[in-house]
């Protein structure tokens, strides 16, 4: 998408459904690859930490998970930047964009303060939860390094992933993210093992490498944004505005809560599966990992829908906003249906990427993982639907009711249903996954219904203004 593509569209007739689909896919593709690149960095860290032994892997893995949970929740607040920019551009008020950018920049730095504080107290927090003292100490040391990456993550991932797509610069995220995978792998190996002339830091080398990579990513994205004449007018120097910061926070904090509600659902499900034994937990991790990779695509489509629905809503074109949302929902469901078909057709091949299928010791895990992938085929469709629906509603600046819907669906329906199926109906891990599917399906239906109602009401209000 060209940087001026939205502006040209504002003066033209509303796009056809096929044009909506093409524009959404064009915007979502680099976002999906950027998110997959972030997953690749995590996999690299895990593999290289594993070379140091189980203790390093456990401490580094838990420390990294703690970091990413904290910053991901806070990044949810910054999703308000993209919809605010999209609305401003749709309304042909691009002079407001620099104010949104610099206010969002200041907000990202403020959000880094609680992230830094939480990560500073990782060791006492883990001790309070009864973790072994040695593990808590190692995780505390790992998090103490990663805490310095919090501002860079909130700027380079939180702010830039919201701002760049909204001004038509999503491809910058793509190339910088891909480069970050290589830089992270090089620094991880070098700092863990003392290779390439770098100091040998052991498992803390991984935290140091991740911190450096995150900051390099943030600095590069900011430099590309400010250095290109095409985008410079979007970031013209101006002071952050406190009322605008309150508006951005008001839109964004329910998104952060929604992220937290969903994250805790999957965390609680994993802990509950662990009660069923190691084979069940291993099968659960395999199925969840596969589903997480596929989820990156509808997540990106949801981010694209956020921008496109917001743009057309800001332009005062409610029909185009409605079409943009439902086309995005269709794309998300279509992709996840194809992905689910792969899980149904080739589950053994997928499980074989994680385990040796001919090893008798893996037999129970293979059977259960194959079964869970079948459930994941259904789970994925509604998961994609709910995340795209959430993005559509963010485009209308509607975040508080979706937060309540997610809380109800995940914790009022999903987890209780899964628990009952697992322990009262005797389905074990499969029951918990059916519970996840039920919770996600309820949220998907609520999000879709809410978008239908909100977008229809937007059209009614526009018609009333036109008649007046």
UniProtKB/Swiss-Prot annotation:
UniProt keywords, alphabetically: Antiport, Cell inner membrane, Cell membrane, Ion transport, Membrane, Transmembrane, Transmembrane helix, Transport
GO MF annotations, alphabetized? antiporter activity; xenobiotic transmembrane transporter activity
- State the source organism's domain of life: Bacteria
Q: Which GO terms describe its biological process?
A: monoatomic ion transport
Where does the sequence pass through the membrane? 57-79, 100-122, 142-164, 173-195, 205-227, 248-270, 280-302, 323-345, 360-382, 401-423, 433-452
Compartments annotated for it: namely: Cell inner membrane
* Membrane topology designation: Multi-pass membrane protein
What's the main place this protein lives? membrane
What's any one GO cellular component for it?
plasma membrane
Belongs to which family?
A: Belongs to the multi antimicrobial extrusion (MATE) (TC 2.A.66.1) family.
> What does it do?
Multidrug efflux pump.
Question: Which named protein is this?
Answer: Probable multidrug resistance protein NorM
Species whose genome carries this gene: Burkholderia mallei (strain ATCC 23344)
Q: Which gene encodes it?
A: norM
């Amino acid at each position: 998408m060209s940087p001026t593509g939205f502006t040209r569209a504002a003066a033209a007739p509303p796009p056809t459904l096929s044009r909506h689909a093409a524009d959404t896919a064009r915007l979502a593709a680099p976002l999906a690859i950027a998110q997959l690149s972030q997953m690749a960095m995590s996999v690299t860290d895990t593999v290289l930490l594993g070379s140091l032994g189980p203790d390093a892997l456990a401490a580094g893995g838990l420390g990294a998970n703690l970091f990413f949970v904290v910053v991901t929740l806070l990044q949810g607040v910054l999703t308000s930047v993209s919809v605010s920019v999209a609305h401003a551009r749709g309304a042909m008020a691009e002079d407001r964009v620099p104010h949104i950018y610099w206010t969002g920049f200041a907000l990202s730095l403020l959000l880094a303060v609680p992230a830094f504080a939480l990560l500073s107290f990782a060791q006492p927090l883990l001790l309070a939860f009864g973790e072994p003292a040695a593990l808590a100490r190692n995780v505390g040391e790992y998090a103490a390094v990663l805490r310095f990456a919090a501002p860079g993550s909130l700027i380079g991932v939180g702010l830039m992933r919201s701002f760049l797509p909204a001004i038509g610069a999503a491809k910058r995220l793509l190339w910088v993210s891909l480069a970050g995978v290589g830089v992270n792998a090089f620094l991880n190996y070098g700092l863990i093992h003392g290779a390439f002339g770098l100091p040998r830091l052991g498992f803390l080398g991984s935290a140091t490498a991740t911190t450096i990579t995150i900051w390099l990513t943030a600095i590069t994205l900011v430099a590309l944004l400010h250095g290109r004449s095409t985008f410079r007018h979007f970031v013209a120097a101006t002071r952050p505005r406190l009322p605008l910061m309150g508006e951005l926070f008001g839109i964004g904090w329910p998104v952060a809560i929604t992220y937290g509600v969903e994250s805790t659902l999957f965390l609680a499900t994993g802990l509950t599966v662990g009660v069923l034994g190691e084979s069940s937990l291993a099968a659960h991790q395999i199925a969840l990992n596969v589903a997480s990779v596929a989820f990156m695509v509808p997540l990106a489509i949801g981010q694209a829908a956020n921008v496109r629905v917001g743009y057309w809503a800001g332009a005062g074109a409610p029909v185009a906003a409605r079409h943009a949302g439902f086309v995005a929902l269709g794309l998300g469901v279509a992709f996840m249906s194809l992905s689910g078909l792969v899980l149904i057709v080739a589950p053994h091949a997928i499980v074989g990427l994680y385990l040796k299928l001919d090893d008798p010791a893996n037999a129970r895990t293979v059977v259960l993982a194959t079964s869970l992938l079948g459930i994941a085929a259904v789970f994925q469709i509604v998961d994609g639907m709910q995340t795209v629906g959430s993005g559509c509603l963010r485009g209308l600046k509607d975040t508080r009711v979706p937060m309540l819907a997610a809380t109800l669906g995940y914790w009022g329906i999903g987890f209780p249903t899964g628990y009952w199926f697992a322990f009262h109906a005797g389905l074990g891990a499969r029951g918990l996954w059916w519970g996840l599917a039920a919770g996600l399906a309820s949220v998907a239906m609520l999000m879709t219904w809410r978008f239908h109602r909100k977008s229809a009401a937007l059209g009614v209000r526009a018609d009333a203004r036109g008649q007046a």
